[in-house]
């Protein structure tokens, strides 16, 4: 179990490491970082090399056992930024605190990506991390996963081995990898059963996790996992609450979370949310065009829409909004987690 604090800073480019100085100013160092979660200013799709640049830059700075989640796409009012989750033992509130557990899966075989093998790998690792942090499923407020995707090269290797990959479409592989990882989280936390997950992979079950936030990228071949939960046994500066937005306009869910933060005397530090274009093609009975825009991926539209809503409600544009919410909340919606600071 690691009690954590968050140090956040906006970035001027994907390779901006000014957060290192901000950490020092706050009395921390890079050695204290257990996870780095950032939004980079790329397109969030397969060829988003802003993630790769950020990953390459920070890999030389952070401890070897720290996990990184670089999510591309800062459309609309979203600000590129980085949040360092740091271990802390500073004096804190007397009861209950946010703790983190971080880890990685083994490399996901190309043939397993988007399939049951990936579900099992993520589920097993999430279970281990929850046990390490002494977190029950009800204590967990976010499971953030960065997972791999299929590239042209990896697809070719798979075919050369005589194995058909889950898809030959690199963009579709992003969604399939997110889906498998989300289902793994849901299985690990008892939100769904393994047969439910198998049915969902076949498109036969509409099941989802209320705390999974999954992003995929070409900069890794394993899954980086960050589990956040409130531990009644821990003392620390932060706590978290979470809810599930029913659609991209669901301000009520967010306002309810902010009311809970206020009732606890808290100050919002970070918001982490998933967003997607409603696959039905409509929102509350009105047609939307996010799925039929040939110029922009629907994930970019969704990030801009949900990012604007959340930034307006919270009063901060340096928030984490990730597009593509397959099995992460209901269709068209997505989980949202608010991390806040409490008085010591």
Curated annotation (Swiss-Prot):
Would the keyword Metal-binding be found if you checked this record's keyword annotation? yes
Q: Where is this region: RU B?
A: 97-232
Instruction: Write out the catalytic residues in the record.
Output: 146, 215 (nucleophile)
Q: In which pathway does it act?
A: Xenobiotic degradation; atrazine degradation; biuret from cyanurate: step 1/1
- What Enzyme Commission number(s) apply to this enzyme? 3.5.2.15
Q: In which residues is substrate bound? A: 51, 71-72, 178, 215-216, 303, 322-323
The residues listed in the UniProt record as binding Mg(2+), with positions renumbered to this chain, are 276, 325, 328-330, 333
What are the residue positions of the site described as Important for substrate specificity? 299
Q: Where is this region: RU A?
A: 1-91
Q: Which GO terms describe its molecular function?
A: cyanuric acid amidohydrolase activity; metal ion binding
Task: Quote the catalytic activity from the record.
Answer: cyanurate + H2O = 1-carboxybiuret + H(+)
Function description: Responsible for the hydrolysis of cyanuric acid, an intermediate formed during catabolism of s-triazine based compounds in herbicides such as atrazine and polymers such as melamine. Catalyzes the hydrolytic opening of the s-triazine ring of cyanuric acid (2,4,6-trihydroxy-s-triazine) to yield carbon dioxide and carboxybiuret, which spontaneously decarboxylates to biuret.
What does the comment on domains in this protein's record state?
A: The monomer structure is formed from three repeating units (RUs) that share the same structure as one another. The monomer, the active site and substrate all possess threefold rotational symmetry, to the extent that the active site possesses three potential Ser-Lys catalytic dyads. It is possible that any or all of the three active-site serines may act as nucleophile (albeit only one can do so per catalytic cycle).
This protein's name: Cyanuric acid amidohydrolase
């Amino acid at each position: 179990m690691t009690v954590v604090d968050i140090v956040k800073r906006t970035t001027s480019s994907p390779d901006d490491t000014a957060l290192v100085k901000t950490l020092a100013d706050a009395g921390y160092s890079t050695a204290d970082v257990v996870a780095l979660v950032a939004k980079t200013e790329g397109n969030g799709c397969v060829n988003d090399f802003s993630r790769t640049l950020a990953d390459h830059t920070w890999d030389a700075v952070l401890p070897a056992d720290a996990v990184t989640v670089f999510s591309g796409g800062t459309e609309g009012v979203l600000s590129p930024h980085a949040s360092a989750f740091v271990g802390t033992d500073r004096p804190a509130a007397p009861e209950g605190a946010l703790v983190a557990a971080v880890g990685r899966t083994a490399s996901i075989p190309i043939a397993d990506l988007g399939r049951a093998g990936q579900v099992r790998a993520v589920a097993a690792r999430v279970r281990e991390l929850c046990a390490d942090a002494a977190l029950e499923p009800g204590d967990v407020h976010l499971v953030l996963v960065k997972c791999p995707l299929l590239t042209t090269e990896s697809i070719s290797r798979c075919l050369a081995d005589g194995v058909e990959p889950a898809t030959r479409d690199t963009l579709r592989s992003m969604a399939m990898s997110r889906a498998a990882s989300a289902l793994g989280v849901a299985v690990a936390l008892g939100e769904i059963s393994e047969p439910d997950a198998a049915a969902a992979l076949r498109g036969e079950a509409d099941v989802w996790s209320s705390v999974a936030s999954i992003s995929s990228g070409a900069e890794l071949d394993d899954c980086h996992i960050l589990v956040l939960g409130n531990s009644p046994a821990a003392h620390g500066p932060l706590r978290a609450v979470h809810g599930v937005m029913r659609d991209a306009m669901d301000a009520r869910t967010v306002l309810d979370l902010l009311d809970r933060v206020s009732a606890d005397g808290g100050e919002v530090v970070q918001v982490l949310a998933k967003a997607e274009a409603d696959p039905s093609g409509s929102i509350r009975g009105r047609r939307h065009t996010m799925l039929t825009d040939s110029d922009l991926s629907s994930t970019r539209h969704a990030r801009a829409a949900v990012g604007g809503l959340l930034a307006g409600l919270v009063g901060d544009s340096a928030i984490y909004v990730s597009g593509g919410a397959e099995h992460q909340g209901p269709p068209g919606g997505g989980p949202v987690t608010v991390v806040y600071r409490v008085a010591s």
